[in-house]
Amino acid sequence: MTDLTKSSLRALQLMDLTTLNDDDTNEKVIALCHQAKTPVGNTAAVCIYPRFIPIARKTLNEQGTPDIRIATVTNFPHGNDDIDIALAETRAAIAYGADEVDVVFPYRALMAGNEQVGFDLVKACKDACAAANVLLKVIIETGELKEEALIRKASEISIKAGADFIKTSTGKVPVNATPESARIMLEVIRDMGVAKTVGFKPAGGVRTAEDAAKYLAVADELLGADWADARHYRFGASSLLASLLQALGHGDGKSASSY
């Protein structure tokens, strides 16, 4: 098994296979769930809009993969600073049956100097998720924060407020995940001593098996070769799946979208 084959198999099992498009339909979500079950193993999760959670749950159960988790998004993609709305959306996602919620951090408020609203918003969503045994991932939108100090600060605030994962991006802005932002966020997890309890998710722009291998190499370097398992690492992607399957000798994987 080559290094690329090994990293591709790892990456596939760490994928949150994603469709977050305005034209998503039940049929597209059903197709996504089918894609999540591959000849070389299942993806960790599918990531979809909240209204599609019931059809995704039904499809995953019917195809014999009830262990594929369902992630969804709230306060998305804008990252506004209205805590009541973010919390209401998160509670609604939980009521739909989400296993995991990816909430967007109010990154523009942080850029304007307000650190408190980000903490309060994440904490409110975390409290709701914790009560329902739902995992909370916090999207800090690194491509908009841009500066290392802001990426670091948003990561730290999210972790202090209870994030189970910190995630780079919505996939809806010009610059999404980059190896540089991944390194900063992984360093925060390491430096805060929370590697046992906090995971990391690069999202948007991780499109090839080679891309995935580079991201995993950074995690292995900073946090050890055994750290990046499904409880601590996810890839938010869709087109990546076809590339991983090709690297694993199962070509013709068709992706749901360009995320």
UniProtKB/Swiss-Prot annotation:
SMART domains: DeoC. It is found in: Cytoplasm. The active site is at residues 102, 167, 201. It catalyses: 2-deoxy-D-ribose 5-phosphate = D-glyceraldehyde 3-phosphate + acetaldehyde. GO terms for cellular component: cytoplasm. Signal peptide: none annotated. GO terms for molecular function: deoxyribose-phosphate aldolase activity. Pathway: Carbohydrate degradation; 2-deoxy-D-ribose 1-phosphate degradation; D-glyceraldehyde 3-phosphate and acetaldehyde from 2-deoxy-alpha-D-ribose 1-phosphate: step 2/2. It comes from the Bacteria. GO terms for biological process: 2-deoxyribose 1-phosphate catabolic process; carbohydrate catabolic process; deoxyribonucleotide catabolic process. Keywords: Cytoplasm, Lyase, Schiff base. Pfam families: DeoC (PF01791). Its main location: cytoplasm. Its EC number is 4.1.2.4. CDD domains: DeoC (cd00959). HAMAP family: DeoC_type2 (MF_00592). Belongs to the DeoC/FbaB aldolase family. DeoC type 2 subfamily. Catalyzes a reversible aldol reaction between acetaldehyde and D-glyceraldehyde 3-phosphate to generate 2-deoxy-D-ribose 5-phosphate. This is Deoxyribose-phosphate aldolase. It comes from Cronobacter sakazakii (strain ATCC BAA-894).
